[in-house]
Design a protein with these regions (language model features):
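Cofactor-/ligand-binding subdomain signature composed of acidic, glycine-rich
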Residues: 1
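HKD-type phospholipase D/PLD-like phosphodiesterase module
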Residues: 4-39, 43-164
Length: 164
């Protein structure tokens, strides 16, 4: 007997696009944040305090300031180098913000769960899901070696499951 590893009850009415590293990805994330009307759920492992990271954080702050309920979950280890000033500006913006699972040491062993999910979802209708973090080095431009990674943009009823 074969046991399927993945089972999915297909529902019509959704659309999926593939994004590659770099500007197609970061541009789509910024556009999704800028067009959100009701809420944004944003979680990632790493966001650097560089041009790319600040671009995305600024978009989240703009959304919160225009009244979009904005939730931000960052991995405590992957974002440990963010400055206190940047973290304070996120806190002060109205974004509902938390760090996931700070590492701790017990009996000489470090225990740490990491948040490697990268999900940006807006209004329960559109989500971007993938492996890319938010930093300049994830642009993967031909002139400079970078990460080559992918994400999918999902639109439609499948996003309801992400919101649940």
């Amino acid at each position: 007997m074969k046991i399927p590893l993945y089972r999915h009850n297909y529902r019509g009415g959704h659309h999926i696009d593939l994004l590659q590293s770099g500007e197609p990805f970061f541009g789509a994330v910024e556009k999704l944040i800028d067009e959100a009307k009701h809420f944004i759920h944003f979680q990632t492992y790493l966001i650097d305090e560089d041009k790319t990271g600040i671009r995305i954080i600024d978009a989240l702050i703009r959304a919160a300031k225009r009244g979009v309920r904005t939730y931000l979950l960052l991995d405590a280890y992957g974002t440990k180098y963010l400055s206190k000033e940047l973290v304070d500006s996120i806190d002060d913006s109205g974004i509902l913000f938390r760090f996931f699972s700070p590492a701790f040491v017990t009996n000489g062993f470090q225990l740490s769960l990491r948040l490697h999910l990268k999900v940006v979802m807006a209004d329960g209708q559109t989500a971007i899901i993938g492996g890319m973090n938010f930093a300049d080095r994830y642009h993967g431009t031909p002139s400079k070696k970078g990460w080559l990674d992918f994400a999918v943009v999902v639109r439609g009823p499948e996003c309801v499951q992400l919101h649940a």
